[in-house]
Curated annotation (Swiss-Prot):
Belongs to the glycosyl hydrolase 2 family. The lineage of its organism: Bacteria, Bacillati, Bacillota, Bacilli, Lactobacillales. GO terms for cellular component: beta-galactosidase complex. Component of a beta-galactosidase. PANTHER family: BETA-GALACTOSIDASE. This is Beta-galactosidase large subunit. One of its GO terms (biological process) is lactose catabolic process. Its EC number is 3.2.1.23.
């Protein structure tokens, strides 16, 4: 198979040769590696890569992936990073509009005409910048002789991959992992990996989030050595019985490779006591159903108690091939007949924030230090929940939320705001995904990868279909996907407020943005058909949060109201050196000669971009502390 640049224009092509999405569990060679938190089955490709920037697809070096290509004039760039922050092209912040509006006329393929697939819209787009990446590497000794996969944890926005001159695959969706099999083309020494990253594709219509518009390989890249028999996926569904005391353990395992030998499974409590032990022969698919644990310790924000699952995989000679450790909790979220959201049988109150991934120097290429700082800030200020606005976050974030009792609304990478709202008016004539058949599989795929990757994380209480994408048959299909795959969580989507006739088919909860307290109360006083929340409220721009108490009072009056997520947690601003003053300063939208611009609308956080809390954080700490 050869790469085809026209895939950029086709909403029905979004992944080529990509391995099926699977759970994000780690795997180690043995217990010693687990203790050191270093797996010899993983080889990082982070660091300096050779790089060439092109202003558009026509100017890109088309054969750069060939082994005999002369790349001596290429620059170098760190991976992970944003291309724009290496000064190759302009930084641009924008809220609703698409970056090309006012310069290039585009409409989503098939949106206005079922026969118009907008050929050349992006593949020949004069504004579609291209990053050509090259990386030479030798396999680590632990990977030699094994099947080898490569995992890109995040690439904005569309990428083609080659190894040693051979086309490997294509992927869109900037914020979920993309994994490919390199085995047919891998060498022990002197491998040449080539990645071509386009800033725009049909995925751009689905990734119109309120943020700086970056591109590049902005999350980690690693090689994975696959043992002869390997646990590729596990689906863990611990349930809480109706007495809210006992736990029911359910697990599905999917093995690949030789699928021979046996596995040893253990479940232990925090004191090391074994609650379950099994030894079974390996088959492609194994199920463990309805194992009852009496008087389990329930997981919640105040007491994030996690049990330890250990799976040891052995070959036919009883040699240990891999160890899979995973922590999980028992918790139960549901809606009562009175339309009250309950966690473990008790009323749930969300003291939440929306959180973009952000670092003032690195953009969305954040670090583990950023994440742990944010978790600590949550706990210091009585924030118990986070909405991953408006895309899946880095994998370690979900583990931190499990461990620290942070309730997660896990949102898909979907926002098509500019396709249905123009100049402040609702005008959905070219809305995607809408009900357009050619866009259906692309958005279901985004739901699938979000689910499959993060399905085992106890902290996730809600799946969110996306943000500000209007509503139609394709949003309904996403809702149905989650309901058919997961009955242990609730589904959320706010955008259906614009299509109230679809509310019975989309979202388990009534969700609004910035609805004034009086309007919230009107809903709650009129026999609400669903529990109510504000997925965005208390817009924290400038001197704000002064009216927060009016919302918090409603929590005491109406149990059907279960709180909301403040917009938002951290400013999106970049720390740059000012040549005139000689100081490092934070710059916002519009400060980079970027037009159009929503200017300081990028600064809506409870914290400045350098993670200094704003005065409004005091209000949050006080009011969220009233309902811990």
């Amino acid at each position: 198979m050869q790469a085809n640049i026209n895939w950029l224009d086709n909403p029905e092509v979004f992944r080529v040769n990509q391995l099926p999405a699977h759970s994000d569990h780690p795997f180690f060679r043995d217990y010693r590696e687990w203790q050191k938190q270093h797996s010899s089955y993983q080889q990082s490709l982070n660091g300096k890569w050779k790089f060439h920037f092109s202003a558009n697809p026509m100017d890109r070096p088309q054969d750069f992936y060939q082994r005999d290509f002369d790349s001596s004039n290429f620059d170098s760039i760190p991976v992970p990073s944003e291309i724009e922050l290496s000064n190759y092209t302009q930084n641009q912040y924008i809220n609703v509009l698409f970056p090309w509006e006012g310069k290039i006329f585009r409409r989503p393929a098939y949106a206005l005409d079922p026969n118009d697939h907008e050929e050349g819209s992006f593949s020949k787009g004069a504004d579609n910048t291209v990053g050509s990446y090259l990386k030479r590497f030798d396999l680590s000794s632990a990977l030699i002789g094994k099947d080898v996969h490569i995992k890109f944890e995040g690439v904005e926005q569309a990428m083609y991959v080659w190894l040693n001159g051979h086309f490997v695959g294509y992927a869109e969706d900037s914020f979920t992992p993309s994994e490919f099999d390199l085995t047919p083309y891998i060498q022990d020494k002197d491998n040449l990996l080539a990645v071509e990253v386009f800033k725009h594709s049909t995925a751009s219509w689905l990734e119109d989030q309120d943020m700086f518009r970056f591109s590049g390989i902005f999350r980690s890249v690693e090689l994975l050595g696959i043992p002869a028999t390997h646990l590729m996926d596990m689906d863990l569904k611990p349930r809480v019985a109706d007495n809210y005391q006992d736990g029911i353990f359910n697990l599905k395992l999917h093995f690949i490779g030789k699928k021979a030998g046996s596995f040893h499974l253990l479940v232990k409590d925090i004191k090391g006591h074994t609650l379950l032990e099994k030894n079974e022969d390996i088959k492609e698919n194994v199920q463990i159903n309805n194992e009852k644990f009496e008087n389990v310790h329930l997981w919640n924000n105040h007491d994030p108690y996690l049990y330890q699952l250990l799976i040891e995989v052995y070959d036919e000679q009883q040699n240990l091939l891999e160890l899979i450790p995973f922590q999980f909790g028992f918790r139960r979220i549901e809606i009562s007949p009175e339309k009250v959201v309950l966690l473990n049988g008790k009323r749930l109150i969300i003291n939440g924030v929306n959180r973009h991934e952000w670092d003032a120097k690195r953009g969305r290429s954040i670090t583990m230090s950023d994440m742990t700082t944010d978790i600590n800030t949550f706990k210091e200020n009585n924030i118990n929940a986070v909405r991953t606005c408006h895309y899946p976050n880095q994998i370690p974030w979900y583990y931190l939320c499990d461990q620290n009792g942070i309730y997660v609304m896990a949102e898909n990478n979907l926002e098509s705001h500019g396709t249905w709202q123009k100049m402040g008016e609702i005008e959905p004539s070219d809305n995607v995904p809408g009900s357009i058949p050619q866009w259906k599989e692309a958005v279901i795929d985004r739901a699938r990868i979000n689910y499959e990757t993060f399905k085992n994380h106890t902290s996730i209480l809600f799946w969110s279909l996306g943000n500000e994408s209007y509503a139609g048959d394709n949003i309904i299909a996403m809702n149905e996907f989650y309901k058919s795959h997961d009955d242990t969580r609730l589904v959320h989507y706010e955008g259906v407020v614009h299509r109230p006739e679809l509310k019975d088919k989309i979202s388990d909860v009534e969700s609004c943005m910035y609805l004034p307290p009086k309007k919230v109360e009107e809903y709650l006083q009129n026999d609400p058909p669903k529990p109510f929340m504000e997925c965005e409220y208390m817009h924290d721009m400038g001197n704000s949060d002064g009216g927060m108490g009016s919302y918090i009072k409603l929590l005491d009056k109406y149990p059907q109201y279960f709180g909301g997520f403040i917009w938002d947690f951290i400013d999106q601003a970049l720390l740059v050196h000012d040549e005139i003053s000689g100081h490092d300063v934070l710059r916002y939208g519009g400060d980079f000669d970027d037009r159009h611009s929503d200017y300081e609308f990028s600064g809506d956080g409870l914290m400045f971009a350098d993670r200094t809390p704003k005065p409004a954080m005091q209000e949050v700490r006080y009011y969220y502390g009233l309902h811990k």
